[in-house]
Amino acid sequence: MFTPTIYFPEIDSKTQTMPLEDSKLHHLRKVLRMKDFDNVNISNGQGQLFIGKFVNDSVQINTQKNFQRKNKICIFIPYLREKNRFRFMIEKLTELNVNRIFIGKTENTQNTKVDTLKIHNWALSALEQSGTPFFPKIEIVETIDYTIFDTCFDITGRVLKNDSPKVNTFAIGPEGGWTPEELSNFKFKYKLSDFSLRTDTAAISAVSLMM
């Protein structure tokens, strides 16, 4: 049975009862049709899930579960102008428990107005839908920092094999691909396919392979 999860980063092990704000109450009662004493989880986004019951417009905490990240993947992705695909990518990276998501421009990135609040809400929605105890650190940057990202995925790179070393920090290129100058800044280049992949497909595939 589906148990809804609420993201509340301020919760800690001392919390016994957590009142819910109106927007959460409306979603639980009107959308999910929850009743008193139904199960509810609360995630602090840092690896802790608080298990409780929905009672009198609050969550009464019964127990707590602690989780450790199996990996600490850090990924750079460019902006996508197609909002549906951009949202899909952010949601899936959140569900896959990516630790840090850098979002920035590349030479071939189309000019796009970035709504940081909207991106945060996409990730929040994915956390609450999937029930993960982890929330990614999302950083909006002007350009890629090659001192952090020395590995990229590109169709000109080496074939990624089963015995290839796992990397947890890597960059995904834009729809138009990396420029030769950008590629020269990476120490390591791998490819996911012999054919060009869309940015969202490449990001999700790369994370899945490196988990």
What are these regions (language model features)?
Residues 67-148:
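RNA substrate-binding interface of SAM-dependent RNA methyltransferases
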